[in-house]
Amino acid sequence: MIVSKKMIKEVSRSLLPFSDAVSSELPMSSLLRLSLFQVSVGIATVLLVGTLNRVMIVELGVVASLVATMVAIPILLAPLRAILGFKSDNYKSLIGWKRMPYIWYGTMWQFGGLAVMPFSIIVLSGDQTVGPWWAGHILVAFSFLATGMGAHLTQTAGLALAADRATDQTRSQVVALLYVMFLLGMGLAAVAFGFLLADFTKFKLIQVVQGAAVVTLLLNLIAIWRQERLKPVEKKNIYKTEAAFIPIMRLFLKSQGGRSLLLVVFFGTLGLSMQDILLEPYGGEILGLSVAATTNLTAIWVIGALVGLFIASRSLKRKKGGPIRSIVFALFIAIGGLCLIIMSDPMNLVSLYYFGSFLIGLGTGLFAVSTLIIAMTIPISKGTGRG
């Protein structure tokens, strides 16, 4: 039997993951390089809601309520993503960049926050010789604020840029691939941080967090290099009045399914994110696990999220109600995972703790991809875009 080039190409496209995300406007090499910004956001996420959360409470003895407040700052900034995306949709530039400035500013915020974060945490823990007692509180709040704002800004503009370059046929697959890269970034970061902080010292903490800042800068520089096509705006049009955010938001809420989508995303994300602050300290304080053991928990969560992504990709191929069914299924799975984690201490079974985390990741993966695909396929109207 003679195998033709066409047959080889068809087999390759069916076997290679996300091969159908490629288009002439966004080839695989550019897509994979662009997706590196998701890896940097994954690194920041692991640090903010996982590793540093547990380190501050268990190793450095910071009060849990104070740590929860600091970790909540980046999460509370999440609603600003709607405004940031809207601004990038309507940004006018003489050079012709629309998304790139926002990704770059986000990178700078992220880099700056991570650069000062380890010293701020050490001061907050009580290792302070000069300055007011509240200096550590202000410094840590600023570093978490800067890193969280940078991650939100980078991710929002980066996803919008990818959606701009993708076609209508490939957009959902591009979104799924970018989410996979985000999960891989989290998983690799969790394993790396667990290994590097196995024998915890303050000096190692400084090395790890500042190393993450440098890696973030390099990854984002590689990701955005020559990714956006230049579309210069004439000087006379720069100062023309642009669409206002509030009227556009009202128009979106009046559209079919707009209000429901926002409510589902808000409460679903709130429920799936609240456990992030407590999960690793719970393993350290209640179950007596080491830094490496609790940080590797994130890797287990990532595996669950990847499984959820695979399930979502299968179920969303159905024409009727695919995303809606996936969202409901995801929330019930996550509730079951939380119940297992609660029962892990009374039953003295660490395996329940890990399996519960896997189920939460599974539910989160299903939920995130389903809501992202619904949002990215909303028709564009005047004054709005993919941001």
Question: For each of these PLM feature ranges, what is it?
Answer:
Residues M1-M28, D127-S143, L153-L159, R165-F266, ...:
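Intracellular loop-helix junctions on the cytosolic face of multi-pass helical membrane proteins
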Residues L48-V55, G158, A162, M274-G283, ...:
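Hydrophobic/aromatic end-of-helix segments at the C-terminal termini of transmembrane alpha-helices
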Residues G50-L66, I277-T294:
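Short amphipathic helix-loop junctions that connect adjacent transmembrane helices
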Residues A64-V71, G136, V175, L289-T298:
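Juxtamembrane helix-start elements in MFS-like secondary transporters
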Residues P79-G96, L197, G308-I324:
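Helix-to-loop junctions at the C-terminal end of transmembrane segments
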Residues I103-W133, F332-N348:
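C-terminal ends and interior cores of transmembrane alpha-helices
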Residues L153-A166, L366-K382:
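Intracellular juxtamembrane helix-capping segments at the cytosolic ends
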Residues I324-T371:
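C-terminal transmembrane helical hairpin of 12-TM major facilitator-type secondary transporters
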